[in-house]
Amino acid sequence: MTVWVGLTGGIGSGKSAAAQCFADLGVPRIDADAAAHSLTASDGIALPEIRRLFGDTVFDTQGLLRRDILRKEVFASPSRKALLESVMLPLIFSEIKKQQETFTDAAYGIVEIPLLTEKRQFISLIRRVLTISAPLEKRIGRVMARSGLTRGEVAAVISHQASESERLLLADDVLLNDGSLKSLREKTMRLHAFYSGIFASKPTQGKHNG
């Protein structure tokens, strides 16, 4: 039976880089954001309900979702954000569960769930939580470098996410990503050895019961 570790962290913490390090070691990897993207891609099963709730203005003339328009709309309105989440979260949950069922032989796998702290229903899918942490200034710098957003825009996104202290309270394990990619790989390798050991001998190890 494959046991699942939920990998989470704030924007710019290095979640995807850490998840890729695990994948490079042969660990099964599931990405909640990738699942969400597939659900809203061309012919994605979430599109009809999104169109019904948000109208044609969030779609282009080819019927493709205008993600930038939808993102601005939900970012500016908590009620619209909740409406979108009412559509997407159950579908993402089901997609992750479906993907998990395709893995049975590995000792453990990684599920990358950025909003795990905010959306606790996903905890039922995992056994243990790994939080990727990084100093705030490093996080802001990373996001600015890759996205072109201003410092103020990045800070606004961070302010809408769970706090670092909230993520740390949920965590079984914490990986501090405050250095180079080489350092991140080394820390990931140590965690891989740890997880491989505990899940081989004690598959229920952890405070979560997914």
Curated annotation (Swiss-Prot):
InterPro entries: Depp_CoAkinase, P-loop_NTPase. It catalyses: 3'-dephospho-CoA + ATP = ADP + CoA + H(+). Pathway: Cofactor biosynthesis; coenzyme A biosynthesis; CoA from (R)-pantothenate: step 5/5. PROSITE patterns: DPCK. Residues 4-202 form the DPCK domain. Keywords: ATP-binding, Coenzyme A biosynthesis, Cytoplasm, Kinase, Nucleotide-binding, Transferase. Its EC number is 2.7.1.24. GO terms for molecular function: ATP binding; dephospho-CoA kinase activity. CDD domains: DPCK (cd02022). GO terms for biological process: coenzyme A biosynthetic process. Pfam families: CoaE. Its main location: cytoplasm. It is an enzyme of class 2 (transferase). Catalyzes the phosphorylation of the 3'-hydroxyl group of dephosphocoenzyme A to form coenzyme A. NCBIfam families: dephospho-CoA kinase. HAMAP family: Dephospho_CoA_kinase. Belongs to the CoaE family. This is Dephospho-CoA kinase. It comes from Neisseria meningitidis serogroup A / serotype 4A (strain DSM 15465 / Z2491). The lineage of its organism: Bacteria, Pseudomonadati, Pseudomonadota, Betaproteobacteria, Neisseriales.
